A protein has these predicted regions:
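Short acidic/histidine- and often glycine-rich active-site loop of Leloir-type glycosyltransferases
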Residues: 128, 316-327, 331-332
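Aromatic "clamp/platform" in nucleotide-sugar-dependent glycosyltransferases that forms part
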Residues: 294
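Short alpha-helical donor nucleotide-sugar binding micro-motif in glycosyltransferases
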Residues: 150, 272, 280-286
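Short hydrophobic beta-strand element within catalytic cores of glycosyltransferases
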Residues: 311-315
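Conserved acidic donor-binding segment of nucleotide-sugar-dependent glycosyltransferases
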Residues: 326-327, 331-337, 346-351
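Donor nucleotide-sugar binding/catalytic pocket of nucleotide-sugar-dependent glycosyltransferases
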Residues: 43, 57-62, 139, 143-194
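A short, well-ordered alpha-helix in the C-terminal region of glycosyltransferases
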Residues: 353-367
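Nucleotide-activated donor-binding/catalytic signature segment of Leloir-type glycosyltransferases, i.e.
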Residues: 255-273
Length: 391
């Protein structure tokens, strides 16, 4: 068996479009090319692409550009010559990280040429489908398109066991493998000098509890619950600061809402931050990550926070809370603003409490991308062997 594999890493989002899946694809490509084998990114064209920055091949295919803040391109992989372009690269396996355009692309290639395919299902797409697609006929078409792409994969991976519920909603009844994501941030004790820089930059008083939210600014991540909980705390006379790091479709509405609640003096809105070391600094100054999302299937930010020994407050039973034991390596709450506020009051006045739990999170739930991709790469060999045995 040839241990060195050539893998196509398919993703519908890649820089300059940035989201969780984009980060995952970059990590897979980087780690595979650092000695395991060869990885090529397969992704739609983007008018702002700067692929020369990356030390591995990036194959771009035709797309339609959507001029939004997120900057997504819609892949258009329907030209026959595009299928041949993948075949001619002699990949050992095609691994898609999105069950939309790129998965359709890989499905068509596999129909023309025998090659094993893997799909990692990262996101609860029904949220976006139900929110954005008007009318039942169009929605039914989208669900069916997605199901066909998922079912075409030789092996389906999920990043958490709870993600399977979303797969079943699309009608997928097949088997799956749980393959957790890693974290691209190393374990660190953020230097006090870096913490002081952030404290001065945002005028954060010493001794005031600092919470943080990192991620897309979109309502269905339960950001309203965070803001309502902060309102409860302020009404109870509590002092604190909430750092909001990220951007997204609802960012203007979110800023308008927290100002309406009278929280402008408590919330620090940083906007888009791409520098990973800077983001670690924000985690380092924070006592607690607030992440009550029930939308996310894995919650990369929970592991990012853990890399800095910052614990997370999560909704009990959510995918993001898998592996979390309350008061040991994280904190759990109900999916309500009141429950979040109660937990914050229990935590915020005991500095050593979140520090101890954060250290446990750093040791128990942190997974490096080296370990995560090594595990995935070993699984590639099994997928290939199973595929060959069926031919």
């Amino acid at each position: 068996m040839n241990d060195k594999l050539k893998i196509a890493i398919g993703t519908d989002a890649f820089p300059p479009t940035t989201d969780g899946i984009s980060n995952v694809a970059q990590s897979y490509a980087e780690k595979i090319n650092q000695g395991l084998g060869e990885a090529v990114i397969v992704t739609p064209k983007n008018p702002n692409q700067q692929d020369y920055k990356y030390p591995y091949e990036i194959f771009r295919y035709k797309s339609w550009w959507i001029p939004t803040k997120e900057g997504y391109s819609v892949g258009w992989p329907f030209k026959p010559e595009l299928h041949q372009a993948i075949i001619d690269r002699h990949f050992d396996l095609l691994h898609s990280h999105c069950p939309l355009a790129t998965s359709y692309y890989f499905k068509r290639v596999a129909q023309l040429h025998p090659i094993p395919t893997v799909l990692t299902y990262h996101t609860k797409y029904e949220y976006d489908f139900d929110r954005c697609i008007p009318g039942k006929p169009a929605k039914d078409f989208a669900y069916n398109f997605m199901l066909k792409n998922i079912s075409a994969a030789d092996e389906v991976w999920v990043t958490s066991a709870g993600t399977v519920e979303s797969l079943r909603r699309f009608g997928y009844q097949g088997d799956y493998v749980v393959m957790p994501n890693g974290c691209d941030m190393p374990k660190v004790d953020v230097p006090q000098s870096q913490v002081d820089i952030i404290r001065r930059k945002h005028n954060i008083p010493d001794g005031v509890p600092v919470f943080i939210y990192v991620g897309r600014m979109i309502w269905y991540k339960n950001i309203r619950l965070i803001l309502d909980a902060c309102k409860i705390l302020k009404d109870r006379g509590e002092d604190f600061r909430l750092l909001m790091v990220g951007f997204g479709a609802n960012e203007n509405a979110i800023q308008k809402y927290f100002r309406k609640l009278g929280l402008a003096d408590k919330i620090i809105y940083t906007g888009k931050v791409l520098d990973r070391a800077e983001i670690q600094g924000y985690y380092g100054i924070s006592d607690l990550l607030l992440f009550p999302s029930v939308f996310d299937t894995n919650g990369l930010v929970v592991r990012e926070a853990a890399s800095c020994a910052t614990p997370s407050l999560l909704v009990a039973g959510s995918c993001a809370a898998e592996g979390i034991t309350d008061d040991r390596n994280g904190f759990l709450c109900l999916e309500s603003a009141h429950s979040i506020a109660v937990r914050l009051q229990q935590i915020m006045h005991h500095k050593d409490y979140p520090h101890r739990v954060g250290k446990a999170a750093q040791e128990e739930i942190y997974i490096s991308w080296d370990d995560a991709v090594r595990r995935a790469y070993d699984r590639y060999h099994i997928v290939i062997d199973n595929f060959k045995s069926r031919q």
